Design a protein with these regions (language model features):
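C-terminal membrane-exit region of the final transmembrane helix in multipass inner-membrane proteins
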Residues: 1-5, 14-19, 23, 76, ...
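Alpha-helical transmembrane segments of integral membrane proteins
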Residues: 31-42, 59-75, 112-120, 155, ...
Length: 185
């Protein structure tokens, strides 16, 4: 019974730290959502461009979206890790596992990244419908735009895969944080 109480208080500390990390780093929360938004909107929109514009326009949108998304995500997650190195080191001193450290520091961003993906999906759909139905309604030869579930699912699968690989890489970075180095500072 005592072990369950300890485990419960341990989990509540990790959950508290996760929430506190999100609350104290509101700008980083925005950038995580923004990176996911960019990935979602630009990848899905780029595949629609071959029907609405040209393949070259689609490729340009895809490259711009991916560069923007990866750069933003890389900078945001690096900032989160670097800003919490002492916290991570202290958690490791107190016996928390790498998984618990990752859950406390990075875990709160997962749901937010998925929310960003959903917002990006809705945005690209709304923007393309606006363009096709209102802006170019009088232009001859503009095809009707329909939401492409297949592209959305492919984009979502790619996003989840890439995001989880990045989180794994950063969890390995957390594992390499030297307690001794932090204590000397």
């Amino acid at each position: 019974p005592n072990h369950r109480i300890e485990k419960s208080s341990e989990l509540s500390f990790v959950e508290y730290l996760k929430r506190n990390t999100l609350k104290s780093k509101k700008a980083l929360v925005f950038f995580i959502i923004f990176a996911s938004f960019c990935f979602s909107a630009m990848t899905q929109m780029s595949f629609s461009m071959k029907d609405l514009s040209s393949e070259m326009m689609g490729v340009m949108m895809l490259v711009i979206g991916l560069v923007l998304a990866f750069t933003t995500l890389f900078l945001a997650i690096t900032t989160v890790i670097n800003g919490n190195t002492k916290t991570i080191a202290m958690m490791r001193v107190f016996g928390y596992s790498q998984k618990e450290c990752c859950r406390a520091i990075l875990g709160g961003y997962r749901l937010l990244s998925y929310i960003g993906f959903i917002i990006g999906t809705v945005y690209q759909y709304g923007l393309l419908r606006l363009m096709v139905d209102i802006v170019f309604k009088d232009v001859a030869g503009v095809p009707t735009y329909k939401f492409d579930f297949t592209t959305m699912l492919i984009s979502l699968a790619c996003f989840i895969t890439i995001y989880e690989i990045m989180m794994y890489i950063y969890s390995e970075k957390i594992k390499k944080i030297s307690i001794k180095e932090i204590m000397i500072e």
